[in-house]
């Protein structure tokens, strides 16, 4: 009986540990290369492995990006969308790239974006760089991730069209 109870408690603890939520503040700087214009925003990000991500913007207030399973919902610049990523390849790459980069699964993100991968570590900061092997209609031309103690602290997503978005995460 004690062994069964102990086993049940261990299984429950393992499930709870796997379902932990990570939450922090973030800043975002979106740079449009053609004009040099930089659009800044900030908010709170909440991630629960493996497929729950919420970015709630406090500036501009009311904007959000929510990933829940295969669904991706956002309100950006007054445009609301709701997409089933199982039926939309462009948004599936965006969804998977965000989830994999936040989770530290950069090998899969590189594979999804057909990118070469390099990883280095200096002074406790792991830097991951992914560079697309060729131009593509979807995905990212370059991705840079920085992690400290397994948590993402910086993410740069460069699109083929010349838009670069940098996120800084503050725990």
Predicted region positions:
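Short, surface-exposed coil-to-beta transition loops
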Residues: 39-42, 60-61, 68, 138-142
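Gly/Pro-enriched, hydrophobic low-complexity segments
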Residues: 119-171
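One face of beta-strands
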Residues: 22-26, 41-45, 53-55
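Short hydrophobic/aromatic-rich beta-strand segments that constitute the beta-sheet cores
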Residues: 26, 53-57, 72-75, 128-130, ...
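N-terminal signal peptide c-region/cleavage motif recognized by signal peptidases
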Residues: 13-14
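Positively charged n-region of N-terminal signal peptides that target proteins for export
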Residues: 1-4
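An acidic-aromatic
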Residues: 45-96, 165
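Flexible, processing/modification-adjacent segments and terminal tails
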Residues: 21-32, 37-38, 77-132
